[in-house]
Every structure is written in structure tokens, then in C-alpha cells.
A protein has these predicted regions:
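Residue-identity detector for threonine
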Residues: 12, 22, 43, 63, ...
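Phenylalanine-focused residue identity feature
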Residues: 11, 20, 45, 57, ...
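Extracytoplasmic/luminal low-complexity segments enriched in Pro/Gly and acidic/polar residues
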Residues: 118-220
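Core segments of small alpha/beta cavity-forming domains
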Residues: 1-78
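Extended interaction regions within the primary functional domain
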Residues: 51, 58-70, 86-91, 174-195
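Generic structural hydrophobic/aromatic packing signal, biased to beta-strands
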Residues: 45, 100, 115, 143-145
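Extended amphipathic alpha-helical segments with heptad-repeat/coiled-coil character used for oligomerization
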Residues: 56-136
Length: 220
């Protein structure tokens, strides 16, 4: 459920309402779309972006490697997507908790309608072919969708995705943007960095370490 829309700065209540609805669609397409979740193309998410960002998103979707801070270069990190063949959803319920709000802000030299979001998505997943081997993965998306007339001056407001995220219950060290669940049977021999640093509560909306972080979690 999105908040009741009110005028914000120079933006009308109708523009705020439209931005809320588009932000909701982006959250759903990026975190609840079954095709993208199970490693397929995130088409629904890409179609909601403005044309400039869509081209960037699709152009780097299959890029492999990491940046200097260790975060994947692939734009697939902008959605929640398990590596093909690494997970099956347990049941039909994905738990969601979060908030969104609107404000006028400056972004890239432009006055934008910023829809701030802070959401947690909790998935129960099992190893394909081994239903007894299951775990939970928690995705945390935060930041803002910034609305302006990015590629169509005089047209409707369009979103620019300026959000980030954390994940718990997935292996660290992804080089392709996909998530790989940290199943109990594989934890001891799992590849990738070992979680370190302060413990993080994955169910807290305040936990925001960034996509390159490999923090220890209290539980999943």
C-alpha cells in the first residue's frame, strides 16, 4: 500500500501519486518477479526505467567482474536474482516490510521528485532436488527513485533508480550479480570470502552496508 499523495514542492499530488505507483511497480518487478528471481531476464524491471537508464541497465546486465570496492560490475545487482539452478522458492509467500515517502531534491543538476524507499524482502528457498536443504535469504533495498523528465522534456515524470541494497543468507563474492543461497549443507565448503566485521541484523531496516559488504549476520 502506497502512502496518500500530497503536493511536494513544485510537484502536484497527481505527480506524487503516479511516482508512488511506479515506485511500487519497480519494487515488485525488482524483488518479486518470479522470472527474474529465478535467474531469468529482468524484463519487467527494465521496461519501467527511463530509456537512458534502461540502455545502461541492459548493456551491463551480463558483465562479469568486480569494481575496486568488490561490488559486481553487472547491473543485475539492481534486482534480486538467484543464479540459474541455485534455488527454488518454498511456497508462495515472500514477506515484505518497508516504507516509502516523497520529497523534492536535487539530483544530477535537476530538481527531482525523490521517492525514498526502505524495504526488506524475505525469501524461503531450497536447493533444487534437495527440499530438506533450505534457508532464508533477506534482501534490503534502500535509497530513492528520482523522478524527472529525463528523456522526454515536457512529458511525464520518469524514474531514475538511485537505490542500493544488502543481502543476508547468500554467499559473498558474487562476480556476476547473481545471488547464491548459503545452504546449511554447503556453508563449510562454500567458495568466496568469509563474512567478517560487526554483526548485522538482516531484519532491521537500518542495516545498510552496501552491495560489496560481506558482513556477519545475527540470523536469517
Amino acid at each position: 500500500v502506497v502512502p496518500a499523495a500530497k503536493p511536494v514542492g513544485s510537484f502536484t499530488a497527481a505527480q506524487v501519486e503516479a511516482a508512488y505507483q511506479t515506485s511500487r511497480k519497480l519494487l515488485v518487478a525488482g524483488n518479486l518477479n518470479k522470472v527474474a528471481l529465478l535467474g531469468g531476464p529482468p524484463t519487467a524491471f527494465a521496461n519501467l526505467l527511463n530509456s537512458q537508464e534502461r540502455a545502461q541497465f541492459l548493456g551491463s546486465l551480463n558483465t562479469k567482474g568486480v569494481s575496486k570496492d568488490g561490488s559486481p560490475l553487472s547491473t543485475r545487482v539492481e534486482v534480486t536474482s538467484f543464479a540459474p539452478g541455485s534455488a527454488e522458492l518454498v511456497g508462495n509467500v515472500i514477506k515484505v516490510r518497508g516504507t516509502m515517502s516523497a520529497k523534492s531534491a536535487a539530483f544530477a543538476g535537476t530538481t527531482v521528485l525523490a521517492i525514498s524507499v526502505n524495504y526488506l524482502f524475505a525469501y524461503a528457498v531450497e536447493s533444487p532436488g534437495s527440499p530438506a536443504d533450505w534457508t532464508r535469504v533477506v534482501a534490503h533495498q534502500y535509497g530513492s527513485f528520482d523522478f524527472a523528465q529525463w528523456s522526454d522534456p515536457g512529458g511525464p515524470l520518469q524514474p531514475w533508480d538511485d537505490t542500493g541494497g544488502d543481502h543476508a543468507g547468500a554467499l559473498c563474492g558474487s562476480t556476476d550479480g547473481y545471488l547464491r543461497p548459503d545452504y546449511p549443507s554447503e556453508s563449510a565448503s562454500a567458495p568466496g570470502p568469509t563474512p567478517s566485521g560487526p554483526f548485522m541484523n538482516p531484519y532491521s531496516n537500518a542495516s545498510a552496508g552496501g552491495s560489496a559488504a560481506c558482513a556477519q549476520t545475527t540470523h536469517v
